């Protein structure tokens, strides 16, 4: 080791370089330069192996006065024989060769001496060929260190010296750690290269999109796009072929950097076959890039990749020439020497629109070899010459994985752009239109849907497919004839187009499907919730009557919806699933819409399962209340709400009330459910009042079973008392038919309710058989007009007369009327003219969840349809004093809304999508938060913990863990976040053969697993047992994959009940998977680097033999303590110790015994100098030093005597010594540091004391203190 270069300086310089923006070659050069200076040798080089076994010197630091430079030279595979590669790669040994003595010593790459060599004096013989090889290089000492990467031998780091030299244990370990630093630098370089490749890919996609969007379908557009792709992929030439389309346009081709015209050549059968991606079975093209994107249930890839159809195929000219149908190319092709072709079909979903062909010329590769071959007999092993010579190799260039992927991405963009132009042209052709409705037909819809699927693949958005069919349209044709029916379909098409025209943001496409069916394509969809208002907008098309032969006809329609990528990934599957959802909508009463669910393909609902689930629904808190506002029709003011119960099934989603209410009555559960509704409604009423200061009438429906229960009345009164709700704010709704079952009992019960202040309304009035005389006896407040009458209100028939009669009757009895199911402005205006008091329905506002209802109470102006007064400014008080001035209910909270107000249309989106937007906001914040933590912290534990904590909080699930695989594909839970219900499973090791056999392969492919109910899922029994052991009812598993290596799994557990995982849950974890994988890899990389640096720091301050401080640590500690004690005016004591007659000990017992002796003495010193501020160091050879801070002379003498006792107790035999055992001589110096005195004065004084102690006869000590210190040249 260079005595003028401390290990600390070396370490500091190496570490600092890793924090700079250096290329891999620059980083390697820094390492070899610093290593050569530190070791004090003539050459340090880093040598990388090529795939053929040869290698190249990538970095070198050399003393040219002693050895020649080898930088950039290639060495043949024979120069490192298989035996050497075995030792370096598989056994991972570092090998030092002593050429002069023809021997070698090896250490494990960990830095430890291997046991087999320890027993053999560390050295073994070296092959004579290798000795002569090194001598020819001018090398007398060498150290070869393997560099590993991904468990493979990447290269070597070689140290050469032109003189004999021994490498110390410290140098061995230092070089082992430097090898680790090189491996980390290589990994970091690979990571940077991947990031750069991703940036290039994104930039290319952006340029292509911009070019096509800006210039459209022009030759200049395609020519520029082709040139852009060719340059990005680093091709020497390129051809873009655009096939004929359905409009009859001829094929087109564009070419870049080619001299001859490819037009006729591309029309040959061979090139048509190659361009369509259908090579002959006899040909074996280069392996294509595998890329899949499967839907998230049950497995899906972590991130969307390009479609499998646009797969590049690589060929060489030699392979093509072997084809029997090969036609010799024009002379110019041969003259330009094109030898390699990458052909990418522009195709997706079996629709081929053209091809991209990339070409590369034959390359000349110049290599400089170390030593001539063949003609120079000196190169016969052992080699005697390393004179450089130049070789020019002719290579057929290949296309690597990243270039293939880039070509695939570019081809997909070209496919989408060309297909878009095809669609544009097709739309202008009559063949693309339905002759009846003049809408695009199935040809356009299929092509546009395929294009939208590809676009969504890269945008990260959803695609929606809607199939609409008229309800009972067959009766129209039968009653009025097909000609009239055709005219009606034309009017339906016009209305649908009008409804779609404001939805340009979704790029809607309406097409005629077949019969009375239409299809609609919507793009840029974020999730299913976003589609709900769009579907309702479309269904509102049928609220106004159609007129046939002067007669108004009311039509209804049903709609089925499927979405990509979650329901399907092809046009065929999406249309199939949308039609299945349409069937479900028709089965649920028509005039509605339904989204496709996987269970739709099977029988809709398993009654036995539904019964079982319903019994648990209350316990599991699966019921929720929605609130539909009741509005005064003359003023638009909000007067009350009706509480409506909804069942949020964990697997089936929302189950319709007409399904579960009759079932609850049949199972005897309706009383419990009804009581829950009452309790929740009253409690929510009070919550609304506390938060907004507004009192509303809360209407609650009562079932027949409840009404007939003798205890029911008391339960109502107790509920009011318990919740504190004023009785006059509660309205109980009973049906007309229920009232007639026991009229006397009903009258008595209703009188009791009225006495308590509770209001009563008769629901569905007009559908039963109550008489006027009975009605007069009932103490009721309101009559509710059934929705069935309101639906036909505008026909001016019997239903209109019934409604007018009910209103007149209510007025005569001094009752209010409430109209249900108002769904159009015309209905609203007609009811206003008829004198109806109150109304509710979708036209006013749909039922709202509690949080959305709260928003409505704060801002009721958003839903008003009355006059348009100036909107008052609502200034909330800033202080409690201001808040106390006046009644809360008197605040100027506006409660009128004009439907012409620009906010009107936006509120429906707000109140219904509020929860989804909140989730999206949380999701975006979570992704940003985790990304920021990744950038802010490189601590692997922080990264892991923040990931599971934030994901569990977002998903609101019971447990989230990170599971890490080991080399045998078992593993351990390394971190977790869980609630109190779930037991902790952190550090649990899982080695389950069932898991390995059934699911490991899928996770290694990067697929996601979502299981909503493990008991009903198609899982192996052994896997179910494993999940039950961990209390799991439902789980969501995302593989953590980096650089195609599976690190582990990010797993979410639901432990109480099954859970249907929403699409956004999957999307969140899929988005996070890549971020987590990169973060973990960076954290582990940093952890490895820190470990290596800490070890370097340790060996830079510890003596390799005795493991006490070394000379460097002694010098730095002495300087530091001298400065500290100078400030506090405390003494510093120094003991210099020397083993007596140690040379004679080595000569008599041997050097290994001498090493063991020094280690025992160092251990004895550590026992007596044990304060935190004390330091024991090996000063050199058999000399040791002990620094004792804040220690007087008396204290130093005590330590000295204790040390002599400890050494005597060791009883190490020493026949040459006068005492018969090993002893120490000790020199002591004690001084209180002063600014004008150099600490070296203390060292020299202790050294003089040691010299005098030895002169007294060994095993003695002598001390100097303060003014007694002899004069030395130590003053500053």
UniProtKB/Swiss-Prot annotation:
Gene3D superfamilies noted in UniProt: 3.30.450.40, 3.30.70.270, EAL domain
Annotated region Bilin lyase domain 2: where?
939-1075
Q: Which PANTHER family match?
A: CYCLIC DI-GMP PHOSPHODIESTERASE PDEF, OXYGEN SENSOR PROTEIN DOSP
Q: Does the keyword Repeat apply?
A: yes
The PTM entry states: Contains two covalently linked tetrapyrrole chromophores.
Q: What family classification does the UniProt entry report for this protein?
A: Belongs to the phytochrome family.
- Please provide the record's keywords in A-Z order: Chromophore, Photoreceptor protein, Receptor, Repeat, Sensory transduction
Question: Where in the numbering of this chain does the GGDEF domain appear?
Answer: 461-598, 1130-1266
In Swiss-Prot or TrEMBL terms, this protein is called Phytochrome-like protein cph2
Residue span(s) of domain GAF: 23-186, 939-1080
| Role according to the record | Photoreceptor which exists in two forms that are reversibly interconvertible by light: the R form that absorbs maximally in the red region of the spectrum and the FR form that absorbs maximally in the far-red region.
Q: Which source organism does the UniProt entry give?
A: Synechocystis sp. (strain ATCC 27184 / PCC 6803 / Kazusa)
